[in-house]
């Protein structure tokens, strides 16, 4: 029997048809929707008089455009309101479950699906959103798709795909104090580059991965896309099973036992072939922070911004120079000496309960600078309630933060939470692109 990687096992088990050129029709187990990338797909279904093939394997939420100040679809502008109204109508017409703003469990799509047990090992999962790779933390093959592909999955519950190469990234060493999963994935991206994963599905493994929580694993897989990868994967284990036990959509009873038997098969075989293998030791890692305008322009908190004149690659040199100009920074200076205007704690990368606990622990009995505007946006209604039960909201408010409603918020400039021109923000989100948090905004 041929040895296989985790990616190959999941892919092969979902092939409906494969032609001689290696292009496949893959069955999709779970299709997640939100208000921004789905309207045109539903319009196309109506124009062709087609139905949704598997409405029970499709779930929708409002997250990108929602206001985190007021529980109203009118609070983020006319375009946002129109998109949310359209999502309500589409889900009603096609019988799709919707977590709208009046649902107590509404939140970011990549937060609510795992916390409700929709995301399970061995699944194929798609969504019209780049950071669908988050779900790979459960040993699911998960990736973002475009609007035309959203239509295709709605209509057929399948998707045309090709096989990607497979990369193994092994993380070893003891996690230093104050280093988080976000630091680890930023370090990986910084070491390998923002295009290092192009054409690959990446499996993260090693002692470090084995010993971190599911929420930390989600952070790592969430940002696999920032390496250019199709998806990120982590093999399921006892930590995964414990997290999924008794979730609303998780299997139960005899089905749970049968699922466990299958999930234990979901790991790369000992002699499985990877197209590329990389090992990184994080024993001496310090907290990481980006200085530029893409995630691989990253340094340790105690390092200086690199001198772009010393960069050999002309392309990287010009990119670094441009980034410094946009960010209003100079080479050979410390970011710890740079003043910030805003702080954002949230996004599908870092808005879960463990993230809020970690941040509140630092903020307890402290006050933020008077000139800094700071917000905390829980990833879901469930996370918000849990945090409030633990009194975390009071810690944030007492320190000077605003405690908001769930949503994507300041991760992207699609709602009212955005930077003003020239403002500098320390953000727990996943992208530091130019204008990502608002025109002229500077994101770290």
From Swiss-Prot:
Which co-factors does it depend on?
[4Fe-4S] cluster
Q: Which residues bind [4Fe-4S] cluster?
A: 348, 408, 411
Which keywords does this chain's UniProt record carry? 4Fe-4S, Amino-acid biosynthesis, Branched-chain amino acid biosynthesis, Iron, Iron-sulfur, Leucine biosynthesis, Lyase, Metal-binding, Plasmid
Catalysed reaction(s) here are: (2R,3S)-3-isopropylmalate = (2S)-2-isopropylmalate
Q: Does the keyword Iron apply?
A: yes
Documented EC number(s): 4.2.1.33
Look at the named UniProt entry and state the broad enzyme category this protein falls under: lyase
Q: What effect on the protein does mutating residue 254 to F have, as reported in its record?
A: In strain: UT.002
Concerning PROSITE patterns, the annotation shows: ACONITASE_1 (PS00450), ACONITASE_2 (PS01244)
List the InterPro entries: 3-IsopropMal_deHydase_lsu, Acnase/IPM_dHydase_lsu_aba_1/3, Acoase/IPM_deHydtase_lsu_aba, Aconitase_4Fe-4S_BS, Aconitase_4Fe-4S_dom, IPM_dehydratase_rel_enz, IPMI_cat
- Superkingdom of source: Bacteria
Pfam families in the cross-refs: Aconitase (PF00330)
Report any one BP term from Gene Ontology.
L-leucine biosynthetic process
Query: How and how many cofactors are bound, per the record note?
Result: Binds 1 [4Fe-4S] cluster per subunit.
Has UniProt tagged this entry with the keyword Iron-sulfur?
yes
The pathway noted for it is: Amino-acid biosynthesis; L-leucine biosynthesis; L-leucine from 3-methyl-2-oxobutanoate: step 2/4
Which Gene Ontology MF annotations are present?
3-isopropylmalate dehydratase activity; 4 iron, 4 sulfur cluster binding; metal ion binding
What family, per the record? Answer: Belongs to the aconitase/IPM isomerase family. LeuC type 1 subfamily.
**Function statement:** Catalyzes the isomerization between 2-isopropylmalate and 3-isopropylmalate, via the formation of 2-isopropylmaleate.
What the entry lists under HAMAP family is as follows: LeuC_type1 (MF_01026)
Q: How does it assemble?
A: Heterodimer of LeuC and LeuD.
Q: Which named protein is this?
A: 3-isopropylmalate dehydratase large subunit
Organism of origin is: Buchnera aphidicola subsp. Uroleucon ambrosiae
Lineage of the organism: Bacteria, Pseudomonadati, Pseudomonadota, Gammaproteobacteria, Enterobacterales
Gene for this chain? leuC
